[in-house]
Amino acid sequence: MTDLIPLEQAHCLPRKGSDHKLGEARLAELLPQVPGWELAEAGMAITRTFRFADYYRTLAFVNALAWIAHREDHHPDLGVHYDRVVVRYSTHDVGGLSENDFICAAKVAQLFDQGITA
């Protein structure tokens, strides 16, 4: 699906059941497309920490990220701190990672790279 367009331009699709859980080969293809993100929890999730100058910028990023989550109907786990946000994606309905996690990771990284919160 997302091989033809960049991940940040793709949109999430409903995914339920283990048929949509990504295997090691597909994870190895997708992970390089989201620089800065790391596999976590034995390949069951991806995480990235985003750092900011202050709490205002941190929360501005969280609010912008919330819009992405709402629009894609795919919601991360967040750890919000004064100067950083830890973002974790996993698809509970498939029991691990799905393409939706990588689509949203790319969109969130693009948001950060564009400096929306500066």
Swiss-Prot record:
SUPFAM superfamilies found in the cross-reference section: PCD-like (SSF55248)
EC number: 4.2.1.96
GO molecular function, one term: 4-alpha-hydroxytetrahydrobiopterin dehydratase activity
Catalysed reaction, written as an equation: (4aS,6R)-4a-hydroxy-L-erythro-5,6,7,8-tetrahydrobiopterin = (6R)-L-erythro-6,7-dihydrobiopterin + H2O
Keywords: Lyase
EC class: lyase
Family statement: Belongs to the pterin-4-alpha-carbinolamine dehydratase family.
Identification of the protein by name: Putative pterin-4-alpha-carbinolamine dehydratase
